[in-house]
Amino acid sequence: MQFLYRSLLLALAVVSLTSCGTYTELIGTWTKPEYMNKGYKKVLVFAVGTKSLVNQSVAERAVAIRIAKTGTVAVPASDVFPLATYDANKDGKIDDPTIADKLAAKLKVDGYEAVLIFGVKDIKEQQRYVPGTVTYQPTSYYNGWSNYWATTYQTVETPGYYTTDVEAYVEANMFDVQTSDLVWSAQTEILNPGSLSDAADSFAGTIVPSIINNGLVSTK
């Protein structure tokens, strides 16, 4: 997954030159029936698969801010579990094999009720051709048929060009801290992310309403 995040950053550099705006589509969601309207009051937001604390923080904060607007306490994992605590050399491998159990225990002690984990699952780049256009502009010359014929239409031509579309597939899962049950899951497609910040904001604006609509966070 670390490779996917590096690929996404490279793709962002390409698409930012031609992007018309970031768009996130919610491909599918699932909610465990018995957890609907659970109304979690404290949630940890965890972005996985990135070696950069900055990138992790940007993604987590975008989602946490959206959730916090409902009245739920939403905390970025990078504030609680810095990358250095489990992958000090940033090699994509967990240093302490018991860290998962330690994190789970700490979440319970600190009063977290749910943890939302998300990460990039796949990235695709597609090149497409945008056809040129020809616009005809009528003129107002009526000085005889020849002049009219010669200048009846002026044309404005825009040449065609190639552009690259970037599609990033991001999966999000919410777990109950006490039972470890998967309570909600979503698959999304982010189209042409102009920047990491744009992608994070677009992603957050798409998944958080689904979480709210299923009653998984408390509301004011």
Segments the model singles out, each with a brief description of its role:
Residues 1-8:
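Bacterial N-terminal signal peptides that target proteins for export
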Residues 21-41, 50, 129, 146-220:
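C-terminal/domain-edge helix-coil "capping" segments
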